[in-house]
């Protein structure tokens, strides 16, 4: 992976990242394709309608079904999905933690029950990389020990100890596999844990900074803490993060979260929010969000965002979308998802432009002004 820090405006950064499959600028939002597809959309939508340069797929879900061996047989995720740009795959640790009621965390890894058939499985630092080697993802995430917040200081310390232990095991294993010709062209990111504990976050960040990861992620946030505490945690981490590696805030978030964390030096984001909210009838616009099911939209001839250039806004009215949603027409999911993802990707583009023009502070003021804040 090639990484170039192009420009800074305060802590906000524009960086250029090149993988084996695409080059993209940050800040970047990565649409989430949990099971190898962004819900209701296909590779053509992602490339030609949205021009997404990188998307995320989920190791936990695709390990269980269809299995990594099936994906490998199709030539990895790129051959399987026909999306020929970059893929980032998470380690599956979050899903093992959140979807399995009886998951158990040991120093060896995470034991969990499949949410599909109840079968038992063990994720280890090595096994999750083996799975991602089969996926041939461009960016692989290591296994980390996630804790729900609030958590005791003792549990947070255990989480950081395990995450550092697993990071050492993962980076050593990855280098040994590359020496065998496996994982060539695949990049590996470490994950910083520590809850909202300043000293534990610092300890984890400093430890992972010493390891030759291609990038660093901030995990374990947006899991129950207040937004202000998340922003404070990210800002406090900034001095301890290598400036010459990408910074990825996992699973975040709202448009406001993106703006606030870009201001604090974050480069990469992913979240299911734009597509999940789309399926529930909620649209994101520059003026805030609204739900299309309201009666006021029945005879509304305007587009969702009058100035929006997405496929949905170029072609269809709020009145039509109100009808599709109430009729439970499946077409609605695609049209709504296209709009919301376009909004998120356009927000990232606008932030890049503002940073390059040294006007991010003014951009942020305008962002909140349009929302009446």
From Swiss-Prot:
Substrate binds at residues 90-94, 144, 193, 220. The keyword Transmembrane helix does not apply. The active site is at 90 (proton acceptor), 270 (nucleophile). Binds 1 zinc ion per subunit. Zn(2+) binds at residues 308, 310, 313, 339. GO terms for cellular component: cytosol. Pathway: tRNA modification; tRNA-queuosine biosynthesis. Its cofactor is Zn(2+). Residues 251-257, 275-279 are annotated as: RNA binding. Its EC number is 2.4.2.29. GO terms for molecular function: metal ion binding; tRNA-guanosine(34) queuine transglycosylase activity. GO terms for biological process: queuosine biosynthetic process; tRNA wobble guanine modification; tRNA-guanine transglycosylation. Keywords: Glycosyltransferase, Metal-binding, Queuosine biosynthesis, Transferase, tRNA processing, Zinc. It comes from the Bacteria. Homodimer. Within each dimer, one monomer is responsible for RNA recognition and catalysis, while the other monomer binds to the replacement base PreQ1. Catalyzes the base-exchange of a guanine (G) residue with the queuine precursor 7-aminomethyl-7-deazaguanine (PreQ1) at position 34 (anticodon wobble position) in tRNAs with GU(N) anticodons (tRNA-Asp, -Asn, -His and -Tyr). Catalysis occurs through a double-displacement mechanism. The nucleophile active site attacks the C1' of nucleotide 34 to detach the guanine base from the RNA, forming a covalent enzyme-RNA intermediate. The proton acceptor active site deprotonates the incoming PreQ1, allowing a nucleophilic attack on the C1' of the ribose to form the product. Belongs to the queuine tRNA-ribosyltransferase family. This is Queuine tRNA-ribosyltransferase. The lineage of its organism: Bacteria, Pseudomonadati, Campylobacterota, Epsilonproteobacteria, Campylobacterales. The gene is tgt.
């Amino acid at each position: 992976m090639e990484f170039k820090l192009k420009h800074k405006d305060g802590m906000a950064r524009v960086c250029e990242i090149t993988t084996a499959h695409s080059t993209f600028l940050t800040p970047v939002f990565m649409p989430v394709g949990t099971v190898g597809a962004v819900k209701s959309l296909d590779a053509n939508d992602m490339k030609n309608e949205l021009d997404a340069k990188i998307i995320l797929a989920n190791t936990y879900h695709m390990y269980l079904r269809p299995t990594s061996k099936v994906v490998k047989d199709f030539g990895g995720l790129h051959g399987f999905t026909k999306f020929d740009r970059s893929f980032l795959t998470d380690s599956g640790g979050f899903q093992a933690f959140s979807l399995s009621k009886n998951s158990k965390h040991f120093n060896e890894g995470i034991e969990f029950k499949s949410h599909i058939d109840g079968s038992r499985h063990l994720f280890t630092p090595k096994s999750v990389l083996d799975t991602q080697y089969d996926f041939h993802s461009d960016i692989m995430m290591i296994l980390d020990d996630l804790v729900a917040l609030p958590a005791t200081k003792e549990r947070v310390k255990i989480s950081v100890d395990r995450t550092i232990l697993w990071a050492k095991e993962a980076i050593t294993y990855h280098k040994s596999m590359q020496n065998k010709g496996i994982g060539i062209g695949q990049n590996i990111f470490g994950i910083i844990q520590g809850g909202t504990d300043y000293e534990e976050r610092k300890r984890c960040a400093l430890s992972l900074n010493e390891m030759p990861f291609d990038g660093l992620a901030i995990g374990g946030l947006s899991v129950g803490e207040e937004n202000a505490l998340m922003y404070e945690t990210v800002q406090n981490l900034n001095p301890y993060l290598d400036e010459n590696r990408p910074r990825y805030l996992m699973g975040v978030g709202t448009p406001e979260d993106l703006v606030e964390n870009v201001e604090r030096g974050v480069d990469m984001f992913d979240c299911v929010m734009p597509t999940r909210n789309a399926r529930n009838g909620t649209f994101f616009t520059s003026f805030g969000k609204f739900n299309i099911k309201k009666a006021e939209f029945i005879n509304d001839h305007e587009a969702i965002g009058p100035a929006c250039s997405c496929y949905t806004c170029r072609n269809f009215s709020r009145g039509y979308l109100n009808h599709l949603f109430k009729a439970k027409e499946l077409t609605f999911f695609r049209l709504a998802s296209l709009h919301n993802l376009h909004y998120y990707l356009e927000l990232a583009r606008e932030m890049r432009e503002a940073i390059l023009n040294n006007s991010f502070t003014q951009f942020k003021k305008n962002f909140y002004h349009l929302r009446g804040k």
